């Protein structure tokens, strides 16, 4: 990844960074909640974004 990124690439990286976080705990406490964890969690070394 070059240090001088295009704006589009930077936007994609920023979105991926925001998505890559654990589930908020208050969501797990809701009634009839089926979600236990964030299934779309991504590790920087294991899974690459492909951009």
Swiss-Prot record:
Stretches for region Disordered: 1-23
Primary location group: cytoplasm
Keyword Metal-binding attached: no
GO CC annotation, single: preribosome
InterPro entries found in the cross-reference section: Ribosomal_eL39, Ribosomal_eL39_CS, Ribosomal_eL39_dom_sf
Cellular compartments annotated: Cytoplasm
A Pfam cross-reference name: Ribosomal_L39
GO biological process: translation
Gene Ontology MF terms: structural constituent of ribosome
Keyword terms: Cytoplasm, Ribonucleoprotein, Ribosomal protein
Protein family (similarity comment): Belongs to the eukaryotic ribosomal protein eL39 family.
Alphabetical list of HAMAP family matching this protein: Ribosomal_eL39
Subunit structure of this chain's protein: Component of the large ribosomal subunit. Mature ribosomes consist of a small (40S) and a large (60S) subunit. The 40S subunit contains about 32 different proteins and 1 molecule of RNA (18S). The 60S subunit contains 45 different proteins and 3 molecules of RNA (25S, 5.8S and 5S).
Function description: Component of the ribosome, a large ribonucleoprotein complex responsible for the synthesis of proteins in the cell. The small ribosomal subunit (SSU) binds messenger RNAs (mRNAs) and translates the encoded message by selecting cognate aminoacyl-transfer RNA (tRNA) molecules. The large subunit (LSU) contains the ribosomal catalytic site termed the peptidyl transferase center (PTC), which catalyzes the formation of peptide bonds, thereby polymerizing the amino acids delivered by tRNAs into a polypeptide chain.
Protein known as: Large ribosomal subunit protein eL39
Organism name: Candida albicans (strain SC5314 / ATCC MYA-2876)
Higher taxonomy: Eukaryota, Fungi, Dikarya, Ascomycota, Saccharomycotina
């Amino acid at each position: 990844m070059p240090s001088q990124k295009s704006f589009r690439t930077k936007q994609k990286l920023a979105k991926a960074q925001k998505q890559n976080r654990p589930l908020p705990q208050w969501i797990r406490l809701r009634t009839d909640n089926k979600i236990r964890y964030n299934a779309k969690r991504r590790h920087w070394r294991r899974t690459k974004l492909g951009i």
